Design a protein with these regions (language model features):
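Single conserved hydrophobic/aromatic residue that forms the stacking wall/gate
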Residues: 1-8, 13
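N-terminal beta-alpha supersecondary unit
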Residues: 14, 20-21, 47-48
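A short, well-structured juxtamembrane/interface segment
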Residues: 19-34
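Serine-centered coil/turn micro-motif
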Residues: 22, 121, 182-183
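Glycine-rich phosphate-binding loops that contact phosphosugars or nucleotide phosphates
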Residues: 36-43, 47-164
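Internal, active-site/partner-interface "lid" segment
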Residues: 125, 139, 166-188
């Protein structure tokens, strides 16, 4: 298990360096140009990663929050405004709950950044910019449980957050403001 995790994680990190090109720069420009908040969404394991990405963005100077796509279809779309930007995660890029939101996002006229494992997926094709977070195989010996694919998405999300932190000139003092408790708060 340890070896599978090591190999899977190394593969994800190695493969991300080749995807940090023009689409990544475009995604950064969309996020920097957002006057509202960055709304991050995803279903299943991608949803857990989306929540972590939203939290990391928010704690490093980019206002962001997570919206569950199932809840968005039942009223929570009201949380998303015309001044926001959406980052949608789906490894397949064809997750029904995410695809249901696409016409609503388009109606708002806000940027849609997709993060999927396939450039040809419906979500990737609908997005204003697509970030490819593909992997050859999952670390799971059955090649089923989202393992390497979620690591790839997490790495891409962290890269976005750090790029935004640097672009905004976010300081340790600002970081301390959003981390008043815990070990990080004490350290700052």
């Amino acid at each position: 298990a340890i070896e599978l995790c090591r190999v899977g994680s190394e593969m994800c990190i190695r493969d991300r360096s080749s995807t940090l090109g023009p689409p990544f720069a475009s995604a950064c420009r969309y996020i920097l140009g957002t006057t509202g908040r960055v709304v991050v969404t995803g279903m299943g394991k991608s949803g857990h990663i989306a929540g972590k990405i939203a939290a990391t963005l928010a704690s490093t100077g980019t206002p962001a929050f997570f919206v569950h796509p199932g809840e968005a279809s039942h009223g929570d779309m009201g949380m998303i405004t015309a001044s926001d930007c959406v980052i949608a995660l789906s490894h397949s890029g064809n997750t029904h709950e995410i695809l249901t939101l696409l016409p609503l996002i388009k109606r708002l006229g806000i940027p849609l950044i997709s993060m999927t494992g396939s450039d040809t997926s419906e979500l990737a094709q609908a997005a204003d910019v697509h970030l490819l977070a593909s992997v050859e195989t999952e670390a799971c010996p059955l090649n089923l449980a989202p393992t390497s694919s979620t690591t790839a998405a997490l790495v891409m999300g962290d890269a976005l957050a750090i790029a935004m932190l640097e672009a905004r000139g976010f300081t340790a003092e600002e970081f301390a403001f959003s981390h008043p408790g815990g070990a990080l708060g004490k350290r700052l």
